[in-house]
Amino acid sequence: MGLLDAGITQHNVLITSVDNVLNWARLSSLWPMGFGLACCAIEMMATNASNYDLERFGIFPRSSPRQSDLMIVAGTVTMKMAERVIRLYEQMPEPRYVLSMGSCSNCGGPYWEHGYHVLKGVDRVIPVDVFVPGCPPRPESLIGGLMKVQELIRMEQIGLSRADALKKLAEKSVDPQFVIERERKAAGA
């Protein structure tokens, strides 16, 4: 028996904070954009299928970064692809979150030692909120990572002062040319 089933009388009052209402709305309508680069993308597609039914969690995949609040990076990120990852990340509206899926996007995977062209983790170019380990991770692991993102959203504070909000935005900003040059120098290319 829920609130709407019981009927609303004239003298009922519902008390909560604005943070709780807004966070509940955001975590109940999470719109991820998948950035599938390798075999992890197959597992991401399997997770989006009817067997796992992500829509029961309020998760509805989008294909445009301007409509997404979560980027799922799934697979090997090369130096050339890093620029596109940064560009898509910058096109997403705030608040935005990143989930790194699989060992290739987490740390370079099996290519990290001898692959001069492979980024040694997507967290070197954009801030990552949740890492999902595995090669490739099972759909259950991805769902667990998505639920971790929802927990992060649940605990967020919306009513920050302007100075705190600007500081938070500055921490998440990315200079693509600096990052690409730094990675190329580290790889010796």
UniProtKB/Swiss-Prot annotation:
<keyword id="KW-0874">Quinone</keyword>
<feature type="binding site">
    <location>
        <position position="39"/>
    </location>
    <ligand>
        <name>[4Fe-4S] cluster</name>
    </ligand>
</feature>
<keyword id="KW-1278">Translocase</keyword>
<dbReference type="GO" id="GO:0008137">
    <property type="term" value="F:NADH dehydrogenase (ubiquinone) activity"/>
</dbReference>
<comment type="function">
    <text>NDH-1 shuttles electrons from NADH, via FMN and iron-sulfur (Fe-S) centers, to quinones in the respiratory chain. The immediate electron acceptor for the enzyme in this species is believed to be a menaquinone. Couples the redox reaction to proton translocation (for every two electrons transferred, four hydrogen ions are translocated across the cytoplasmic membrane), and thus conserves the redox energy in a proton gradient.</text>
</comment>
<keyword id="KW-0813">Transport</keyword>
<feature type="binding site">
    <location>
        <position position="104"/>
    </location>
    <ligand>
        <name>[4Fe-4S] cluster</name>
    </ligand>
</feature>
<dbReference type="GO" id="GO:0015990">
    <property type="term" value="P:electron transport coupled proton transport"/>
</dbReference>
<comment type="similarity">
    <text>Belongs to the complex I 20 kDa subunit family.</text>
</comment>
<keyword id="KW-0520">NAD</keyword>
<dbReference type="GO" id="GO:0005506">
    <property type="term" value="F:iron ion binding"/>
</dbReference>
<dbReference type="GO" id="GO:0009060">
    <property type="term" value="P:aerobic respiration"/>
</dbReference>
<keyword id="KW-0472">Membrane</keyword>
<keyword id="KW-0408">Iron</keyword>
<dbReference type="InterPro" id="IPR006138">
    <property type="entry name" value="NADH_UQ_OxRdtase_20Kd_su"/>
</dbReference>
<dbReference type="Pfam" id="PF01058">
    <property type="entry name" value="Oxidored_q6"/>
</dbReference>
<feature type="binding site">
    <location>
        <position position="40"/>
    </location>
    <ligand>
        <name>[4Fe-4S] cluster</name>
    </ligand>
</feature>
<keyword id="KW-0479">Metal-binding</keyword>
<comment type="subunit">
    <text>NDH-1 is composed of 14 different subunits. Subunits NuoB, C, D, E, F, and G constitute the peripheral sector of the complex.</text>
</comment>
<dbReference type="GO" id="GO:0051539">
    <property type="term" value="F:4 iron, 4 sulfur cluster binding"/>
</dbReference>
<dbReference type="GO" id="GO:0048038">
    <property type="term" value="F:quinone binding"/>
</dbReference>
<keyword id="KW-0004">4Fe-4S</keyword>
<keyword id="KW-1003">Cell membrane</keyword>
<keyword id="KW-0997">Cell inner membrane</keyword>
<feature type="binding site">
    <location>
        <position position="135"/>
    </location>
    <ligand>
        <name>[4Fe-4S] cluster</name>
    </ligand>
</feature>
<protein>
    <recommendedName>
        <fullName>NADH-quinone oxidoreductase subunit B</fullName>
        <ecNumber>7.1.1.-</ecNumber>
    </recommendedName>
</protein>
<dbReference type="GO" id="GO:0045271">
    <property type="term" value="C:respiratory chain complex I"/>
</dbReference>
<keyword id="KW-0411">Iron-sulfur</keyword>
<dbReference type="GO" id="GO:0005886">
    <property type="term" value="C:plasma membrane"/>
</dbReference>
<dbReference type="InterPro" id="IPR006137">
    <property type="entry name" value="NADH_UbQ_OxRdtase-like_20kDa"/>
</dbReference>
<dbReference type="GO" id="GO:0050136">
    <property type="term" value="F:NADH:ubiquinone reductase (non-electrogenic) activity"/>
</dbReference>
